[in-house]
Amino acid sequence: MDASLPAHMRPERSFQGFILALQRFWAEQGCVILQPYDMEMGAGTFHPATTLRALGPKPWNAAYVQPSRRPKDGRYGENPNRMQHYYQFQVIMKPSPPNLQELYLKSLAAIGIDSAVHDIRFVEDDWESPTLGAWGLGWECWCDGMEVSQFTYFQQVAGFECAPVAGELTYGLERLAMYVQGVDRVYDLNFNGRDGDAKVTYGDVFLQAEREYSKHNFEVADTAMLFEQFKMAEAACRKYLDAGWREGNRKEHLMALPAYDQCIKASHVFNLLDARGVISVTERQSYILRVRELAKACGEAWIHTEAGGAA
């Protein structure tokens, strides 16, 4: 850890300092530090900086925080560490460097977790995202018996092989910060590193939203409207891609990114419908397949763009 930081910005003192320490570490490894994508998504992997940039031959190194929404995980703010909205810190490096695991351990040291003191283990757990048509060889990263990160080598995204293979790291920020700060309830996390009246906790920032969105996700969200929104997002995705393929200069105007926004939207709407309990087991698989087909179509368009590596 950087001893020159003011006390309130040290990663063991504040949630925001914790995030800044990770951003600084990965910036020093050559990653571009991106901002969160401005759409609702279930995981940081959905960010186009990972899903689309993992495809094609061009090198790409990026890191970013991404708010993640999983409507079914809400507990009305009553569970100490389970929420429908939380933060992930995502790192993608393509091609994957040979020392990625070593870099990960150094990143833990940067936030106050020394592998010489703590029991750090990598438990084999291959990763898969059915809605993204993606999978990879992976490991859960455990610290003193608690899962804190996921470590994956992407093999396939949107149904396409990843060549070169990209390495991805996903940090569960709240869980790691709770461990570093030594608190048992996420809402007790010190957010700004201050004391007394100046102290702002995670609960001060997010508890009211967690209560209200849990009610929204389980009880209030209009299911008829959501079904219609899914169909609209699905249709828009395909319409944008069709328009892109008709363009003369395909490498510049394939519409992969606007279309992928609609894929993200469809995925989130599906998650809301799932939380409302209005999708049967059979229908659930059908919806997952429909989102996967959108992701695949967007991935195909992306690899034909200049940014995606098309010649």
From Swiss-Prot:
<keyword id="KW-0648">Protein biosynthesis</keyword>
<dbReference type="InterPro" id="IPR045864">
    <property type="entry name" value="aa-tRNA-synth_II/BPL/LPL"/>
</dbReference>
<dbReference type="InterPro" id="IPR002310">
    <property type="entry name" value="Gly-tRNA_ligase_asu"/>
</dbReference>
<comment type="subunit">
    <text>Tetramer of two alpha and two beta subunits.</text>
</comment>
<dbReference type="Pfam" id="PF02091">
    <property type="entry name" value="tRNA-synt_2e"/>
</dbReference>
<dbReference type="GO" id="GO:0005737">
    <property type="term" value="C:cytoplasm"/>
</dbReference>
<keyword id="KW-0547">Nucleotide-binding</keyword>
<keyword id="KW-0067">ATP-binding</keyword>
<keyword id="KW-0030">Aminoacyl-tRNA synthetase</keyword>
<dbReference type="GO" id="GO:0004820">
    <property type="term" value="F:glycine-tRNA ligase activity"/>
</dbReference>
<protein>
    <recommendedName>
        <fullName>Glycine--tRNA ligase alpha subunit</fullName>
        <ecNumber>6.1.1.14</ecNumber>
    </recommendedName>
</protein>
<keyword id="KW-0436">Ligase</keyword>
<keyword id="KW-0963">Cytoplasm</keyword>
<dbReference type="GO" id="GO:0005524">
    <property type="term" value="F:ATP binding"/>
</dbReference>
<dbReference type="InterPro" id="IPR006194">
    <property type="entry name" value="Gly-tRNA-synth_heterodimer"/>
</dbReference>
<dbReference type="GO" id="GO:0006426">
    <property type="term" value="P:glycyl-tRNA aminoacylation"/>
</dbReference>
<comment type="similarity">
    <text>Belongs to the class-II aminoacyl-tRNA synthetase family.</text>
</comment>
